Structure formats: C-alpha cells, structure tokens
Amino acid sequence: MSNSRSILSQPEWRIVDQSSLGPTFHALQSFAMDDTLCTSIGKGESAATMRSWVHHNTIVLGIQDSRLPHLEEGISFLKENNFNVIVRNSGGLAVVLDEGVLNVSLLFQETEKGIDIDLGYDTMWHLIQEMLKDYDVTIEAKEIVGSYCPGSYDLSIRDQKFAGISQRRIRGGVAVQIYLCATGSGSERAALVRDFYNLAIQGEETRFTYPEIVPSTMASLSELLDETITVQDLMMRLLKTLQQFAPKLTPSQLTIDEIPLYETNLQRIIDRNNKALGLEK
C-alpha cells in the first residue's frame, strides 16, 4: 500500500469537521461542500482536505434508485419512518445515514500521472486499517453480496460489511468518501433499505438489477468489535492517524472565496435532487 501511503503523506491536511452540526445540517449541503472543496483543491487553491460529517436519519439514494417503478411508495415508507430522502450527485445506490454513522471525505489533487480509481479506494481502505489497527481483526475490501449499495470496496470484518466507499472527481480534484457504521444495528439499517426496495419494486421487472438485501450481511463496528465505538471515538482515531502522515493539521471552514461557489453548487444540487425526485413544478 505504499502508493496509498504517499497520498496520505501530505505536508498539510486541512480539516473541515462537520460531524457535530446536528439535525439541521442537510445532506445536500454535504455534497455541495465536497464539490466546492474538490474544485478548490483541483485549482491548487487549497491543501488536501479531510472533511468529516454526520447526518441525522437520511436515506441517500443513487440515480438508479430514482428510476424505481414505485419510487413514491418507497419514499413515503421512509418518511413514515422519520427519514429524509435525497438523491446524490454520483453513482451508487441507497445508503442509510444517522447519528451512528460517521462519513469521511478525503479530497486531494490529481497528480500529473493521474490517480487511478483503485488507488483512491486503496487510500481510504489503508486509512481505516490504520485507524483500527489496535484491534485484532482483518478488514477486507471486497463486495459483500446482500448488503445495500454493494461494491468491490465494501469494507468488512468476518464477511459483515460496516462501511462503503465511493469516489467523485471534479476538474483535477479527487474526493473519496466513506460511510462508517459506528454504533447501532447494521442489520436494522439494512432491513429498512430492503423494505424500501420491496415497496418501490413490488415484483416488477426493471432494467437495472437492484440488490436483494440480506440484513445479516451488515453490522456496525460496535457490533463487530463487541465494544462501543462512537462517532466521537472514530473522529479521535481519524485525527490521530492523519497526524502520523502529516506534520500539520489545520482546522478550517469554507474561505470567503469558496462561499459563492458553495452557494452555486448547493442550488445546482437542490435543483438536480428535486428533478430526480419529481418535485419540480
């Protein structure tokens, strides 16, 4: 993993911590934040950045989910269970965010030779392994069939998935994003998504193959390690681990120059979300 180590080894990591903003912090704001930071980094106007974030009771759908035949019924079910629903601006499928899920974005500049997609994923996998290295467990990166939003870089312990990684690129910037289920029940989160798909598909044939979710394939880190590991615990581990790779961690929010771009990005993402959910008038 020497190449992923080289990406983590930055002269400075800019730290944008939004993990304790509470229930008013909306997931659409998060995607606008990452797009803004990715653009700044791509232009060379910002150091490599780690952004951490938590959203209360939110289901983030992928573009393919917005094409489900009975989407409205599925969304109504999620709202009845007190979940907000949005469609993200990148690939993948439905994931669950709540107070027990820490999201982390690593944002860095493309190199002249380019950073291939697998290297981006490997970098995040390496970071999580370093964060949890004092536990006597093997963290594997492979697809966990039966999980929600399955992919080849699902992170698992003993074949139970606790994290999923995605990636986005904007004009010379790379954003690698992960959700880490810290506390709560992984199988209950998975059952919620399973029931959503059942209501949104209702046995109809679809062009796209949606996952058949088996709740027992998913668990939180607290369940897997038999020890309560909170979002705050993971944040402390994350910052300590980054300190091993960079001499300087700089707490930050958006700069004055970044705010107008953020506002533009947010409006674009809101409009796209409304279109995907059929909320346009």
Swiss-Prot record:
SUPFAM superfamilies assigned to the protein according to its UniProt record, in alphabetical order: Class II aaRS and biotin synthetases
Residues flagged as site, Lowers pKa of active site Cys: K161
Pathway: Protein modification; protein lipoylation via endogenous pathway; protein N(6)-(lipoyl)lysine from octanoyl-[acyl-carrier-protein]
Further comment found in the protein's record: The reaction proceeds via a thioester-linked acyl-enzyme intermediate.
GO BP: any one term: protein modification process
Name of the protein in its database record: Octanoyl-[GcvH]:protein N-octanoyltransferase
Alphabetically ordered keywords of this record: Acyltransferase, Transferase
Species, as recorded: Bacillus anthracis
Purpose: Catalyzes the amidotransfer (transamidation) of the octanoyl moiety from octanoyl-GcvH to the lipoyl domain of the E2 subunit of lipoate-dependent enzymes.
Catalysed reaction, written as an equation: N(6)-octanoyl-L-lysyl-[glycine-cleavage complex H protein] + L-lysyl-[lipoyl-carrier protein] = N(6)-octanoyl-L-lysyl-[lipoyl-carrier protein] + L-lysyl-[glycine-cleavage complex H protein]
UniProt record similarity statement: Belongs to the octanoyltransferase LipL family.
Active site, UniProt feature: C149 (acyl-thioester intermediate)
Organism superkingdom: Bacteria
One Pfam match: LplA-B_cat
